[in-house]
């Protein structure tokens, strides 16, 4: 699912991180630099 700026401000289900590219995931690639929501 898309999230963040690319997804109309949507957040990710299940507490997943929103990457700088606007996609949901749980790895540092998503949760690290540039993360848009649910960041760790």
Curated annotation (Swiss-Prot):
Native source species: Fagopyrum esculentum
Domain of life: Eukaryota
Keywords associated with the record: Antibiotic, Antimicrobial, Chitin-binding, Disulfide bond, Fungicide, Plant defense
A biological-process GO annotation: killing of cells of another organism
Gene Ontology MF: a single term: chitin binding
Gene3D superfamilies: Endochitinase-like (3.30.60.10)
Name of the molecule in the record: Antimicrobial peptide 2
UniProt-listed InterPro entries: Chitin-bd_1 (IPR001002), Chitin-binding_1_CS (IPR018371), Endochitinase-like_sf (IPR036861)
Post-translational modification: Not glycosylated.
Disulphide bond pairs: 3-18, 12-24, 17-31, 35-39
